[in-house]
Amino acid sequence: MSRLQPQQQQRGRSSSFKDNFQIQKPLQSLTPSEQQQQQQQQQQQQQQQQQQQQQQQQQNNANNNNNNNNNKFNNQYIQQMKNVENDIKKWIGEKCSSSLSDDFLEKDLMESLCTGTILCVLINMIKQGTIQKIHLQPNYLQRVENIRNYLRACWLFGLHSKYFFPSSYLLSMTIENNDNSNSSKTTTNNNNNNNNNNNNNNNNNNNNNNNNNNRAIITSPNKNGGVNTMIVNLEYKEKIMINLTELCKISLKIKNFGSFLQLSSSSSSTPPPPINNNNNNNNNNNNNNNNNNDLLISNNSSNISSPNSFSDSPMGFSSSINSSSNNSNLNTPNNYNNTNNNNNNNNNNNNNNNNNINNLTPQMIISSPTSTSSTPPLPPCANNINNNNLKKRTKIPKNNNNNNNNNNNNNNNNNNNNNNNNNNNNNNKIIIKRDCKKVYRKRKSSNCDNDDNGSNSDSDSSDSSDSSDSDSDSLLSSDGTPIILSQSSNPESVSFKSFIKEILHLKNIISKQDKTITSQKQTIETLEKDLEFQKQLTKKLLSSPIDLSNFIETSSDPNGAIPVSIQAFTRQIQQIQTLQQQNLSLETELSKTNEHLSTNIRKNSKLENEVLSIETELLNLRMKYANTLSSSNSNGNNNSNNNSLGCNNSINGSSSGGGGNNSSTSKGTLSRTISQPFPLRKSISHSNIITSPVNSHQQQQQQNQLSQSQTTSPKNTSASYNNGILSKSSIVSNTNTNSTYKFGSSTGILKVSATLQQKQQQQQQQQNQQQQQNQQQQQQNQQQQNQQQQNQQKQNQQQQNQQQQQQQQQQQQQNQQQQQQQQQQQQQQQQQQNQQQQQNNQLSQSQQLQQQQNQQINNLIDSPLIISNSSNQQIESESIESDSDYDKDMVDFGKKIVSALISSSNHVEMSEIYKMNDILTNETSRRQICIVLEEETKINQLKLPMNENSFEVTLYLVNTILQCIHEAPSKDYFSLKLIMESSRILNRKKVNGSCEFIQEFIKDHPTWKDIKFWEEQYWDELIIKHQQFSGSGSSSSSNTGGSIVTTMTTTTTVTSAITSSSSTTSDDFDVDYTELVNTLLISYVYNLASWGLSKSDVKEFTISMSKKSFLKSNELEKLIEQVTSTVELSFTSDHNVCKGPHSFVLKSFRIISECNYCRQYIWGVRGIVAREAFECVGCKYKTHKKCLKEASEKTFCSSPNVGAPFNVKHEMHVGLAIQGLPSGWRTLLLQSGFQDYEIQQHQEDVLDVLEFHHVYNEKQQNSIKLLTNNSNNNNNNNNSNNNLQQQQQQNQQLKQKLNITNNQQNNTIININITSPSISVNNNTYNNNNNNNNNNEINPSSPNNNNNYYDSLLEIEEPSFTLKDLVSLENPIDLYKVREVVGGGSTGKVYVGENSITGEKVAIKKMKVDNNNIKNIINEISTMKNSKHKNVIKYVSSHLVINHIWLIMEYMSYGSLTDLISNCINIQCNGNNQQQQQQQQQQQTYFIESHIAYICQQVLQGMDYIHKGHRTHRDIKSDNILLGKDGSVKIADFGFVANLTRKKLQRNSVVGTPYFMAPELIRGNQYNHKVDIWSLGILARELSEGEPPYAKYPPVRALFLLTLEGVPDFKEPNKWSSDFIEFVNLCLNLDDKRRPDAHYLLRHPFLKKACSSREFADKVEEIYNTRKNQFSDINFNF
C-alpha cells in the first residue's frame, strides 16, 4: 500500500495538471457571454455547497442523538451472537480433537474471506448440490476440512448471518494509529477558509492519512481474560466486507425462497414499518470520528425511497435477527445530496479527497429516482456501524462533506480537479437502483471528464445493464477470486446481477431441456408399446396358418370350384411355412448340441490329450516292430529295405535339422521333440499364444523327401501319398491363418480344434482304405492258389488212370516237382510281403511327418507358456502334477496370497505364509500364481490404495517370494516374472517404480546380475509394444504410454529367429516412436547402468535391442542417437554427482534422498520400509568413522561453524553444569567414564540410560530378594537381619534434580525431575571377568519411595487363567529327590532332581509366590506348557508347596552356554608344601565358525517358533541357552516373555540383560520381537570373541555407547568370513524396522555352513572335559 500511494499521487497530480491546462486553454477563446455563463454556474455551485454544509450540520446533530439509543441494543445483540458462536464451537469440538484453539473459527473465516474463496465454493456447491462429509477421526488436514465443511453448510442454509457479526475479529477492528483522527480534525477545521494556502494544507493532511491508515488491528478476547491481537491489511478488510454483503443477500434469499437464484419481490417479503427519514439521517462527520457515512445515496429529487424488500440492502439478515431489529426503532444511515449534475461531480471529487484511505476499495451508491419517505430499520449490528471500531472495519465508502468547496476562486476549482485526479483509483461502484431492482457494477475510467452535464441516472443504468449483459463469459479473475470481488483494471468486468441473470438463463434452458427430454421419453415409450404389439401380432401369424381364401379371387363358376393352380399354390405356401418352423426347431437343437459338445470337449480335454499321446506311442511301437521285421529279412531283399531306411533317415534328418540351434535330435526313428523354432509370441500378460506358420524352406525339404520316397514305392500306393501331401498342405494353410487360442482356465488346458478332428478322421479313413486293399489282395492270392491246386489234382488223376504202371517211377518226379512249386509259391509270398512292408513304411513315413506337425501344434496349444530348454516330457509331467489334489490346494493358497499382496490386507495368517516355500519351489504352482497375479494387478493396480500399516505385511510376503525364487534350482521365466510383478505391487503409485526394486534385488542377489536372463524380458516388452501399435495404430499408444512393463520370453534363440524376420517386416508396420523410446531409455539404460555394468555392455545391449524393434531406418537412427546420449550422460554423471554405482536419474524418484552428512543415497525400498529422512542410519547413530570425526571436530573446534566473521571467540559465555547430584551419582558417572561435555551434548541419552539402569537394577534386586528368601527358608533363616538391612537399602530411591544454571549472568535453574537409578553390586553378568570395574560401585541413598511408575513398567499383561489351572495336586517331595544347586533364573534358583520311581534326572526351579511376581510366574509356566519344540526346554510339571512353586523341566547335562564360551580360567594350584602362586598360560577354547552357525541356527528355530505364537522372549543370552549330550541346543528361562496381541503389538517395559539389550529398549521406545534378533547378534559376537561388546566397560557406560555408536567392529575381521559378518550386521542393525526377522535369517547362506549335531556334541564334550579337569586340580588351603 505504501508503495502504491506515491505512484497514485503522482498520477493524480499529472492528471490534474492536464485538466487545468485543458480548462485554461479554452477560456482565451470563449466569448464574453460564455464566460458570464460559466461564472454564473460557479456561483450556483458555491450556493449549493453552502446549503449542503447546513444540511450536514443538521444531520450530525441528529446522529449524535441516535448514537445514544443504539448503544442499548448493541450489547444484547453481541451477547446473543456470542452464544451462537459458542454452540458452533462445541459442535465442531465434538467432531474434532480437543487440541483446537479457541479462535480457530475466526482464523479460518478471516483467511477464507480474505482470499474470496467462500463465494466461489458456495456457488459451486449450490450448483452441484453436494457438501462433503465430516471426518469422525480427523488428522490435521481433515480437521481443517471439517471446519470448512461446517461453514459451507451454514452458508447453504442461511445460518452464516448468526456467525459472521458476533466474531470478535470483526467487532473489534481498530485503527493502528490514533493520530489520524487528529489530522482529520485539522482538515475539517481548515475547510471553511477561503485562502489557497489552506486548501494546500488540506491536501497535505489527506496524503498523510494515506500513509498511516494501511493496517488495522483485530482483537479477540482470551480465556484468561487477556486480548489476542492481529494486524490485518485494509485491502483484506475491504474484501471481507464485500463478501459479507454479497453472502448476506444470498443467505436471505436462500432462507426465504430455498435458492438464491430467485429474485425477491415486494409481495414475498413484507416491508418493515415506515419511519420518518429526515435530513437528520446524514452521517457526514466533519468534527467527530465516531459518526461516518456508510451509504452514499445520490438522488435527482429531494426525497429518498425505501427499499421494497430487505434483500436489496447491502447487508441481509435471517429472520431471528430481523425480529430483534424490528423491535428496535432505529434509523438507517443515509445521506442527501440535492444538487445538480455539476454539484454531484464536485461532491464525488471531494469525497474522494477526504477518503484517500480507501484508494483500493469500491464504493456503494444507492440511487432512487422515486420519492418516498420510509426506510426499513436495520438490526443493531447495522447501527453499530456508527461506532469508530465498525467504521474502520466495514470499509463501505464514506461520504465526508467537509470539503473545500466554499472557496470562490478559480484556484479552489483547480484544487477540486486535483482531488479528482488523485482519486481515480476508486474504480468500482456498486449501484443499486430501486425501481428496476438491478444490481450492476460500473467501471469508472481514469480519464473520464466529470463536467459532462448530460449524464443522468437513467443513462447510467442503461449503460451498466448493457455492459453486464455483454460480458458474461469469464466469471473469475486471474488471481482466482470472482470478478465481482476482484479489483482489476479491466473495464469489461461482470456485475453480480449479470452473473445471477446468466444463472437464471441457464436454469431456464435446463428446464426447457428437461421438458424436451420428458416429451422424448414419452414418445419412446409409445413407440416401444407399438413394437411390442406388432411383435405379438407376428407371433400369432406365425403360430396360425394363413388362409389365402380371403385374399384370392374365386371363379365365376356357380359350383364354386377353385382352379387347380391356386390350390397347388396354397399347398406349397403351407409346406414352406412348416419347413420354416422345422428349420427353426432344428437350429435351436443344433445350438444346444453345439453347446453340449463344447462343454463335453472342455471336460474331456485331458482324456483327448492322453489319447493322442497313446496313439503316438502306438505308432512308435509299430515302427519298432516294422524295424525288427525288416532287420530279419534275407540278404536278397536288402536293397529294398535299404531304400526304405534311407527314406526314414532322410525324414528324420529333415525333422531334426529344421529346428535350428534350439532343436534336439532323437535316437529313434521318430523324433518327439519340437523341431521347429518357437514362434514370435505374445507375453504372458495377453493370456494367449499365436501359432506360427511353417517355414517355406522346411516345406520344400519335406516335399522333396516325399517325392524321393515315392519313386521307390509301387504304383498302387500313389493315392495314399497324395492324400498325405494334401493333408500336409491343409495343415500349412491352417497354420498360416494366425489363429489365436485363448486359455479356458487357469490350468492352461484347451479344447481340441475342428481342424485337428478333421485331420484325425482323414487319417482313419486312409488307414481303413489301406486295410481293405490289403485284404482284397490277400483274398485274390488265395483264390489263385486254390485254382492251381485243383488243376494239378485233375491232371494227376488222369495220369493215374492212364499210367498206372508208371506210378512208382513218376512218383519221385512228382515229388520233386511239388517241392519246386512250393518253393516258388514261398518266393511269391515273400515278394508280396516285401511290397506290403514297403507300402506300410512309406505310409508310416508320411504319417510321421503329419504326426510331427500335429504334435508341434498340440504342444503350442496344450502348453500355456513356452518354457526355456523344456521338452514335451517336462510339459506332460507338469500337467500330470497340476492334476493332483496337492497342487490344487497349493494353487488355491497361492491365489489367496496374491489377493493379500494386491489388497495389502492382513487376512492371511503369518503362520500360513511359511507354506510359500513349498508353493514357489513347485514350477506348476509358481506358473499359476504368476498368471493370477498378473491378471489381478492389471485390474486393480491403480484402484487399490497402499496403506502404511499394511505395507510391512506386503513387503514380508514379497521378501519371502523373492527368497524362495532365489533358492529355486532353475531361473525360469516365471521367477523373473514374479520379481517384476512384486516390484510393480510395491510401487503401484509410481510410473517407473519397478526399476528401483529390481536394482535392490540384484544388489542383494549378485548371481542374478546377468544380461542374458533379462534380455528376453526386454525383448518381450518390444513384442508387446509392436503388437499393440500394429493392431491399434498410434491412437492406442497414448493409452499405454504411462505404464512401463519389463517382461520377457525365455530362450535366446527366439531373438535370433525373429531378428532374421525383422528385416523383412520392418517396412510393413508403423510403430509409435516415442513409446518405444520411453521403454528403451527408462527400463534399459537407467536400470542397467545402476547394476554396476560397464558402459560398453549397456550400450551394446540397448543398441542391439533397438535394432530388433521393428522400426524404420530413420526412426532407428534417431533412437540409437538418443540411446548413446543417455548412456553417456548416465555414466559421466557418476563421477560428478553420484556416489557409487547409482546413476543420476535416481534423483527423480521421490523416495530416494541424499544424506546430509556422508552424501550417500538413502534407498526407500531396501526390503523393509520406505524412509523419508535425510540422514542415513549410520550418520544418525554416529557409527560411520567419518561422522565420528566430524562430530569430534565440531565439539572441540575453537570457533563455531557460522558465517563470516570467522574465528569468533567469546570471553564471557553461558555454560551448562549439573548441580545437586549426591556423592553416589557422581562416583557412578566418574566410574562409568562420563565427562562434562558428553553429558552436555547427550543429555537425553544419559537420562534414558540412567532410567533403564534403575529399572533393571530394581528387577535384579527383586530377583535377589526371592533367591535370598529361598535360601533363608532352606537354611532356617540364619541371616534374616542382614537381609532386612540390605532390602531397606535397596528399596530406597533418590529423586534427582538436574539444575542447568547460567554460571555467570542469569543463574536461572531448569528443574528436571527424574528418579535416580539405584546401583547394585550384582548388576553385571560377567562378574568373573570384570571385578575391577564393578567392586568400586556405590549405592546412593534414596530418601523417597516412589515405585508406582516403575512397577507399571515391569507389569506384564494380565493372564486369562489362574495358578490353580497350571499346578498339579501331587506332592513333589514324594516324587522327586532334590540334589545340589545348578544355577539361578530370573525368578528363582534351579536344582538338580531325580525321579524316585524312574531315576531320571530333572531340573527343578523353586520360585516363591508373592503378589508382586505371581503374574510373571503364571506367564512363565503357561508359555513353557504351551511350547513344544525341539529347541525349547521341555516342561514336565509344576507343583505348589506352601508358598513356593516347583517348576520341573528336563535336565540338560552340559548346562548353559556361558560356561563354554569364555576363556579358560587362570588356574592357581595351592598346596601345603607348594611355592607361591604361579600363573599358567591361558588356553583359549573358542568355537569355530561352523559351530557358531549351528548354535545360531538352533536358536533361530526356537525363536521363530516363539515369534509365530506372537510372543517375545526378551532375555536371549548365553546364560539361557542350554546344551545337551546329544548336541541339542534349547532356549530356557521364560520369565520375561511378553505376549503380543492385536491390541498391543509392541511393548515398552524394561526387561532383559544390559549387554544384550537393543537400543530401542534402552531408550524406552516401543519394541517388538526384533529385540530378540539383536540379542542373537550379541550372542554371535560373544561366541566369536569370548565376550559381548563393551563388556569391559561398566554397565552405564556400555548402555550409553550402545545407544549412541551401536556395536563396534570385529577385533579380527580377517579371521571370519564375509557371510558371518553380514549375518551379524543384519542382526545388529540399529534401525529395528530394517532388522530382519527369524524366518528371513534362517535362509541366510551363513547358516548353511553349520556342522552336524554329532560334531557339535563332540566339541562340547571336549570343552566340558577340559574345564572339568582344570577345576579338579584346584586345591584350597584355609
Curated annotation (Swiss-Prot):
Biased composition annotated in UniProt, kind: Low complexity: 1-15, 35-73, 180-214, 276-359, 399-428, 631-654, 662-671, 695-713
Residues of the CRIB domain: 1202-1215
Protein kinase domain boundaries: 1376-1647
Coiled-coil spans in chain: 512-542, 570-628, 752-862, 1269-1309
Named cofactor requirement(s): Mg(2+)
Protein name: Serine/threonine-protein kinase pakD
Keywords: ATP-binding, Coiled coil, Kinase, Magnesium, Metal-binding, Nucleotide-binding, Serine/threonine-protein kinase, Transferase, Zinc, Zinc-finger
Species of the source: Dictyostelium discoideum
Residues in Phorbol-ester/DAG-type zinc fingers: 1141-1197
Residue pairs linked by disulfide bridges in the UniProt entry: none
Biased composition annotated in UniProt, kind: Polar residues: 17-34, 215-224
GO biological process, one term: aggregation involved in sorocarp development
Phylogenetic lineage: Eukaryota, Amoebozoa, Evosea, Eumycetozoa, Dictyostelia
Domain Calponin-homology (CH): residue ranges: 82-189
Segments for region (Disordered): 1-73, 180-224, 262-428, 442-489, 631-672, 693-722, 1267-1292, 1323-1346
GO function terms (MF aspect): ATP binding; chemorepellent activity; protein serine kinase activity; protein serine/threonine kinase activity; zinc ion binding
EC number annotated for this UniProt entry: 2.7.11.1
